[in-house]
């Protein structure tokens, strides 16, 4: 079916993007019945349990080396993206909606490109400038326009949540690629990132506004968060599979199709919960196109 390793990588990245586009829809529905803290922790525990089973089944659990370069790269990927990035992303879903938060979060290659120019001395190009402009336009279209006063200020403040998530997810693929190049164990890499994320959520719960407490969770919320945890865990796994077959610069932007998946399904799955407009779709398209243009830089 696939004629090259890069094609396998592209297919894996597309699968990850599709799964990550479905997850926010499940989570948004779950937030009808529970709060962000409970939803985040349930989802993260499900992801970890799923990956423990997969790591035992594949035997990759035996490859773990706590002193190796791969372990610490996976650890940083989990600490930055899968924990802080995820919490702020879910806060964004709760405050501004699944489609908007997903679009803003997936502007992360924009921040990656800027950091590369500033700190790594990479040369800016026309593709870089065009991609940045498209992404900025997409985020601007999503931002509140006609609202006035305190409501507009509050909406803008809430947009900081997915923007912070975008920053966290922007550096994430770099750590993933370093780790997967050192040890080609995608399941193990995903497991370490997700376990690290869970650990960081407990350690830094207060600063990031996560409430750690026992609470009753309604059955619909538990089911939806469980499904969301499965899509999150498998989506993350497929990004590692993708990076094991090709460069991050090409494959990372491909799994950023998730805003389009979220937008395409939100109209049918979030009816009565979240208003999704053509403006949201246009913004998602601008951001995704911008990400692909950036990849050409």
What is each model feature region?
Residues 1-38, 42-74, 86-96, 137, ...:
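Membrane-interface interhelical linkers
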Residues 36-37, 98, 124, 185-186, ...:
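Membrane-helix interface/capping residues of multi-pass secondary transporters
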Residues 39-40, 101, 188-189:
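Juxtamembrane helix-start motifs in multi-pass secondary transporters
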Residues 46-51, 104-118, 133, 196-200, ...:
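Alpha-helical transmembrane segments of compact multi-pass small-molecule transporters, enriched
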Residues 51, 114-120, 126-146, 277-296:
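Hydrophobic transmembrane alpha-helices of multi-pass small-molecule transport proteins
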């Amino acid at each position: 079916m696939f004629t090259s390793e890069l094609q396998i990588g592209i297919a894996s990245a597309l699968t990850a993007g599709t799964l990550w586009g479905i997850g926010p829809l499940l989570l948004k529905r779950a937030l009808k019945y529970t709060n962000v803290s409970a939803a985040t922790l349930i989802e993260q525990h499900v992801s970890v349990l799923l990956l423990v089973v997969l790591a035992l089944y594949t035997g990759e659990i035996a490859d773990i080396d706590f002193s190796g370069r791969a372990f610490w790269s996976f650890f940083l990927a989990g600490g930055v993206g899968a924990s802080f990035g995820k919490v702020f992303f879910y806060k964004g879903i709760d405050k501004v909606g699944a489609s908007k938060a997903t679009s803003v979060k997936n502007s992360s290659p924009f921040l990656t490109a800027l950091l590369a120019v500033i700190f790594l001395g990479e040369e800016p190009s026309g593709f870089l400038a065009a991609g940045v402009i498209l992404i900025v336009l997409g985020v601007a279209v999503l931002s509140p326009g006609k609202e006035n006063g305190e409501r507009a200020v509050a909406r803008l403040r809430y947009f900081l949540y997915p923007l912070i998530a975008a920053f966290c997810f922007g550096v994430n693929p770099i750590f993933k690629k370093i780790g997967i190049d050192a040890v080609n164990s995608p399941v193990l890499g995903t497991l370490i990132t997700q376990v690290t994320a869970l650990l960081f959520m407990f350690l830094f719960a207060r600063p990031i506004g996560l409430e750690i407490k026992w609470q009753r969770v309604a059955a619909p919320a538990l089911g939806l968060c469980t499904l969301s945890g499965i899509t999150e865990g498998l989506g993350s796994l497929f990004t590692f599979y993708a990076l094991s077959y090709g460069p991050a610069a090409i494959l990372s932007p491909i799994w950023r199709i998730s805003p389009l998946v979220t937008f395409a399904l939100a109209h049918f799955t979030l009816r009565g919960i979240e208003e999704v407009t053509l403006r949201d779709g246009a913004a998602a398209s601008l951001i995704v196109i911008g990400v692909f243009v950036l990849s050409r830089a």
